[in-house]
Amino acid sequence: MKAVIQRVSEATVRVDGKKVGSIERGVLVLLGVEKGDETRNADWLAEKIVNLRIFEDDGGKMNLSLMDIKGELLSVSQFTLAGNCSKGRRPSFDTAAPPEDANHLYQYFNGKIWEMGIPVQSGIFQADMKVSLINDGPVTFILETPKREP
């Protein structure tokens, strides 16, 4: 499971011109689910994102988490994060989870964040979405869940 997380002062996702999710201060998460990902991956990622200290304290140091600031989270599924661009000029999505599995884990991830007390807004799975944001900083991180040891 891969996530691009961005600290935002606001973010919105639209489908067919209609706003389907919007947050103020918080984190925008672009989430990609890969073959072999399980609920344990979503658990790890949710815990990491909610507690990652990427917000500034009064001294200007990144010392506060999403939980600390009582921020919001906008979750957008993005299967292209599972794309492999190492060969040729067209990305391969062979490592992307099948849609049914990906949607299940995407919804599970959103539920875990909600259970932790963070307000969650989301896009629509498999929809063509338009995402707008004000990246605060800018602060952007790429997270990848640990792979299972063979």
UniProtKB/Swiss-Prot annotation:
GO cellular component, one term: cytoplasm
A Pfam match: Tyr_Deacylase
Highest taxon in the source lineage: Bacteria
EC numbers for this chain: 3.1.1.96
Keyword Lipid metabolism part of the UniProt annotation: no
Cysteine disulfide links: none
GO terms of molecular function: D-tyrosyl-tRNA(Tyr) deacylase activity; Gly-tRNA(Ala) deacylase activity; Ser(Gly)-tRNA(Ala) hydrolase activity; tRNA binding
Locations listed in the record: Cytoplasm
Motif (Gly-cisPro motif, important for rejection of L-amino acids): 137-138
Catalyzed reactions per annotation: glycyl-tRNA(Ala) + H2O = tRNA(Ala) + glycine + H(+); a D-aminoacyl-tRNA + H2O = a tRNA + a D-alpha-amino acid + H(+)
SUPFAM superfamilies xref list: DTD-like (SSF69500)
Keyword field: Cytoplasm, Hydrolase, RNA-binding, tRNA-binding
GO biological process, alphabetically ordered: D-amino acid catabolic process
EC class of the enzyme, as a word: hydrolase
Functional description taken from the UniProt entry: An aminoacyl-tRNA editing enzyme that deacylates mischarged D-aminoacyl-tRNAs. Also deacylates mischarged glycyl-tRNA(Ala), protecting cells against glycine mischarging by AlaRS. Acts via tRNA-based rather than protein-based catalysis; rejects L-amino acids rather than detecting D-amino acids in the active site. By recycling D-aminoacyl-tRNA to D-amino acids and free tRNA molecules, this enzyme counteracts the toxicity associated with the formation of D-aminoacyl-tRNA entities in vivo and helps enforce protein L-homochirality.
Domain statement: A Gly-cisPro motif from one monomer fits into the active site of the other monomer to allow specific chiral rejection of L-amino acids.
Family per record: Belongs to the DTD family.
Assembly with partners or alone: Homodimer.
Protein name listed in UniProt: D-aminoacyl-tRNA deacylase
Species, as recorded: Geotalea daltonii (strain DSM 22248 / JCM 15807 / FRC-32)
Chain's gene name: dtd
